[in-house]
Amino acid sequence: MTKFETVRGMKDYIGIDAEKIRYLESIFRDLAIKYGYSEIITPVVEEFKLFALKGGEELRETMYVFKDKADRELSLRPEITPGVARAYIQNLQSSPKPIRLFYFGTVYRYDEPQYGRYREFRQAGIEMIGDSSILADLEVLDLLYNFYDKLNLSNDITIKINNIGVFRKIMDKYNIEDNLQEHILHLIDKNKINEALDILEKNIKNKDIIDFFNKILTKKDTKLEDIESLAELEEVSRLDIKSEFLYLFRLSRILSNLNIKFKIDLGFVRGLAYYTGLIFEVLHPSVQFSIAGGGRYDKLIELYGGLPSPAIGFAIGVERTLLVIKDLKVEEPVNVIVIGMSEDAIPSMFMVSRILRKEEYKVVINTKDQPLSKLLPYYASQGFKLAIIIGKQELEKNMITVRNLITRKQISVPLENVEDAIKQTL
C-alpha cells in the first residue's frame, strides 16, 4: 500500500499547534486594525518575474517555479510584499495616501530545511504605501514592538536597525549598477565582507572610500552619540550621506524616548533586494536567526510600473515567533460533552448544544454507544470539564443533568436553565 507523508520541509499543525498559529493571527489582526490598517489577501501564485525583476534570476534556485498549461512561468510566493505592491498598482493607486494594509498568509521557499527554517511557513505583516516621513517609519516600528509586547516578549527582544541608504548613496555616487549593488549587499548580508570590499575596490578605486566603507561595516553596536559624530566627518559630507546618518540619529532618539529596545548596527543589511532606507530585524536571545524584519522600499512600486510611491513594511515569521515563546497559553472555552442515553434524547441534545454554543462554549455531542460509567471517565481524560446528561428520567421531567467531570458535582435543572447550572457547577 502506498504511504503518503508531508513533503520535505513542510509540516502538519494539529490541535493546540494550529490554535497557537490562529492565536498569533488574531493578536496581530486586532492590533493592525487598531492602528488603522485594512486586510489584504493576495494570491499564493504570482508571475515569477514579479520576484525576479528585482531579486534576479538566481532566486529561481530558492523558489517553487513552474509553468502552467498556457506556458506562463509562475511561482509560489516566497514573500508577500511584491504581491501587495502589484495589488496596489492594480487596484489602489488612485486611492488617498497613505494606504495602510496588513496580511497573514503562507509563503514558500526552496531552502534546506533546518531548525527555524521551513519550505512552507506563515508571515504576518503590514505595508504603508505613499508616505516617506519619519512618522511612518516610527508607526511601523511601534506596531511591531507592540505586537511582541502583547506576547510578553518586549523585554526579551531587540530591534536591530540601520539605514541601507548609506551604502546605496555611496555606490550610486560611483555609478555602481543596480545588479552589482545587490550582489555586494548580498555578500555583506552573508558576512562575506572581504569579498564585498574587493568588488568595491575594483569599482571605486579610492582607498579612502574603501577604508571608510570598512569602518562603517565594523560598527556593529553603535551608540547614539557616535552616529551624530559620524554625520560630521569630512568623508560623510563628501559622499553626500550626512542626511542618512542624521535620519538614523533622529529615529534612534525618538525610539529611545518611546522605550523601544533597539541597537544600531551600521554593518547590517537585509538580503531582500528592494530596500532603500531604514531596515530592521527583531532578535531574540534564544535563537540565532531573526524572528521578524522589514524596511523601506521607496522604488519598488515604480519598478513594477506604478507611479513613484514611497513605502515601508515588515513581515513577522509566525513559526519562528512561536519558537521563542516559552509558555503560550491559548485561552480556550469550557469543553462540554452532551450525552443522550436514547434516541428520544437527540432533539434535546441538539437544542442544549445550540444554546451553549451561542454563549461561546465548546460543545461536542457524544456519538459513542457505551454506558455512562465508561463515557464519563473517558471524556474527563480528554479534557472535558462538564457533561450534560439526558437520560430517561431527565426526558420525562424535561430536565437535564449537568455534571462537573473534575469535582463530580452535579445538579439537575430544566433545559432552559442550563447556563445557570453550568455556572453553579464550575
From Swiss-Prot:
Location within or outside the cell: Cytoplasm
GO cellular component labels: cytoplasm
InterPro entries for this protein: aa-tRNA-synth_II (IPR006195), Anticodon-bd (IPR004154), His-tRNA-ligase (IPR015807), HisRS-like_core (IPR041715), HisRS/HisZ (IPR004516), HisZ (IPR004517)
Source taxonomy: Archaea, Thermoproteota, Thermoprotei, Sulfolobales, Sulfolobaceae
Catalytic activity: tRNA(His) + L-histidine + ATP = L-histidyl-tRNA(His) + AMP + diphosphate + H(+)
GO MF annotation: an example: histidine-tRNA ligase activity
Protein name: Histidine--tRNA ligase
Record NCBIfam families: hisS
Cystines in this chain: none
Top-rank lineage group of the source organism: Archaea
Entry keyword set: Aminoacyl-tRNA synthetase, ATP-binding, Cytoplasm, Ligase, Nucleotide-binding, Protein biosynthesis
Main location: cytoplasm
Similarity comment: Belongs to the class-II aminoacyl-tRNA synthetase family.
